[in-house]
């Protein structure tokens, strides 16, 4: 991993022996949240996921646990990049972070890390975002993508 772009510790837990139970828990939670996302963002969901790809099957990429220590970061980026099949990004915050550590979008919106909060947004270039460094506490998230 290039530390000028991203500095954190990442662990992919999908298809890793010993992580099957956690994988099932995240899968159930993701499905519940995607159903809610589709209800509240139906037109956007259908446009970005189904119409543009002409596909009806959507799958998740699995789950990556990320630990970001104080002063670690992820620079401005979008999640589609060279992975054209990525359509939505999902991020679960696993702990509260009091100072810094937020996800910031290029619109100025800042999402504070709060345990149990999940965020879903398009993985496309208009949703540029970054992981702002936590100042004093370590931040834990689980992230992944819906793809077609």
Regions found by a protein language model. Name each.
Residues 1-118, 126-148:
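Fe(II)/2-oxoglutarate oxygenase catalytic core
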């Amino acid at each position: 991993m290039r530390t000028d772009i991203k500095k954190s510790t990442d662990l992919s837990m999908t298809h890793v022996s010993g992580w099957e139970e956690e994988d099932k828990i995240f899968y159930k939670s993701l499905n519940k949240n995607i159903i809610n996302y589709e209800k509240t963002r139906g037109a956007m969901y259908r446009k970005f996921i189904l119409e543009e790809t002409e596909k009806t099957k959507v799958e998740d990429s699995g789950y990556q646990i990320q630990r970001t220590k104080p002063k670690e970061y992820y620079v401005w980026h979008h999640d589609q990049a060279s992975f054209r099949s990525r359509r939505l990004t999902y991020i679960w915050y696993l702990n509260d972070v009091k100072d810094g550590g937020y996800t910031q979008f290029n619109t100025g919106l800042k999402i504070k890390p709060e345990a149990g909060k999940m965020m879903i947004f398009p993985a496309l270039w208009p949703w540029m975002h970054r992981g702002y460094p936590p100042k004093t506490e370590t931040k834990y998230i689980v992230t992944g993508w819906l793809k077609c």
